[in-house]
Structures are given as structure tokens and as C-alpha cells.
Amino acid sequence: MSSPRAAREESLASASNDRLMKSEPKVRVSLPEGLSADTLREMYYRMVLTRLCDDRAFALNRQGKIPFAATCQGHEAAQVAAAYALKRGTDWVVPYYRDTALALAYGVTPREQLMCLFARKDDIFSSGRQFPNHYSVPDRKIASISSIIAAHVTHGVGMALAFKMRKEPVVTLITFGEGSTSEGEWHEAMNFAGIHNVPVVFLCENNEFAISVPQKLQMAVPNVADRAAAYGFPGVICDGTDVVATYSVVHEAVERARKGEGPTLVEAKVYRAMSHTSDDNQLTYRTPEDIEALKGRDPIPRFAGWLKDRGLMDDEMIAQMKKKAQAEVDDATDWAEAQPPPTEADLYTHVYASGPLS
């Protein structure tokens, strides 16, 4: 047992720590490998920024200002974690249409995101041609994707094979929903990746619904990760609403691929908080009670609590971050809406190559 003096000193130290916490957050525990306090706070900011971009997209759609929106609410932790597990400027991302958080965490700006939604002429992804969230930013290592479900998985595996053949230390991250795993091209890509031992990480963001089809009606096994064994590489499951847990799993898979040890299938168990897209109504296949229960799995307050428990953030800092993110989204919206749309003169741009033939 401690002496009265030791107990008093411990009490005073605790009180002092409480005062420090109220004035400025202090790190009280060791942090995950590769993540500093500043990086963790930045990851939280990216999650909040994505949520506000998502909310704005659906509001603009309901106002008739943009034609379509796809939500990533409930996926933010898995996507941001995956982005930070990669080596920025070296590793490639082959995303799918629900990857707003991944894009915003890997170099896409809110202005660029909103330009895409408004389909403006100077939209950097496709000059207003593609569906929203069909990213293509080669200079930031974000590959163009296809609207055909799971087609991009085969493309990504081909990229990974090319990097291996060139002996480049590059890892390719390919993301998709569990609905994609019912497509033939997904299985072709997995089989090819296993045979050729390519440096790829497959990230399945399993939100349990392929539009309106629940997982139990599209899979005979409980987990997507269970399928990896048939292709000769590991399958790992993680809680996709836990950003730190997901980071650890994806980071390990990335480093494994970089060392030449082959593919990994990571299944992040997430949830979809809203309808599939702005053209869907989830109340036709989900009960209001089911939808309300999902709020308890929200990754943003969960990560905020984790950061607060470790002295990395406090309520004031959280409020300031949300205010900053909201201002950034407001600016992006006003700026993007004011940009000119494509005209007939732009019809054949990006169709034919320009410049000398030689």
C-alpha cells in the first residue's frame, strides 16, 4: 500500500494533469506505429471534411443543382485509414464510386470534389463527363475507374503486375464493396493476383448491402475475407468503423506487398448510413429502427472519443475543426458552382490527341 504522502502527491499530480488537459491536450499513451499526434488529428479532420462534403452533395441534389450523389457515410474511418497506410506519391489507389473520404485523404481537394458534382468544364477527373466520384488524378496516383462494377479490380491487378515486372517498390490498393465480390471479374482478378503474387492490397468495404440486396442473399460464407484462401493469399477482417484498427491491418498488408510477399484481402466491416445513392430509397428495404440503430456505429464520434481519451484532442479543438471544415466546404461549393459548364466546343476535347504526329 502507498504511504499517505505518496497518495497525496499522486492526487496533486492528477489534479495538475487535469488542469493541463483543459488548457492543451497532452499525449498520455503510445501511438500506433507510423502515426504521430498531428497525423491522427489530420485523419480526424479528413473524416469530418468528408462528412460535410457528403451532406452538401445530398443537399445540392435535393435542390436540383446536381443530378446525382453517392454517400460514403459510415465508411469514412476505413477509407481514411487506408489512405494513410499508403506511401503518398508512390503507391497507387484504384478506388470505387463510394470513396469520397479516400480521395480527400489522398490529395483531392474539396473544390475538386464539388467541381465533379457540378460537372463543370474544368473538372479535373473528366471535364464533367463522368458520374460523380469517378476519380482520375494520375499525378496523385489515383487511377481512373469504370462504372462497371468490379471492372476496376482487374485493371488494378494489371497495374500491380506492371509494377512488379518493372521492379518498382509500388503497392496498389484496390477498393470495392461486397457486392463487387459477386461479379466474375472480381474472381478473375483475385485468381490472377494470387497466381502472379502481385503487390496489391484488396480492400473490401463491406456495408452489408449491394444497393438493396443484403449480404445473406449474395454470399454463402459469412465473410468476404474467407474467400482469400482459395486464391492462395491471406484474408483479414477488421472493424472498419475503427480508424486505428483499420490502419494497422492495411499498413501491415501494404508492407507485406512491398516486400514481395504478395496480395492480401482486407475486409473492413463498415455500414452505409444513408441510401445507396440519391436515386435510392433505403426505406423500401430497411426499417426505420434498423436505420436508427446504425447511428451507434458512427466512426466520427467514435474516433473523437478515442482521441479525447488519449489526450490528443478536446471538445474545443473538435468544434474548431468542424467549423474550419464547414468553411472549406462552403467555399468549395460557392467556387465550384460559379465555374462554367462544358459547351458544344468542348465536345471533342479529350477524345483525340493533339500535337504533332512525330
Segment roles from a protein language model:
Residues 1-78, 84-85, 268, 274, ...:
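Conserved acidic/glycine
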Residues 141-338:
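Glycine-rich ThDP/TPP pyrophosphate-binding loop and its adjacent helix/strand module
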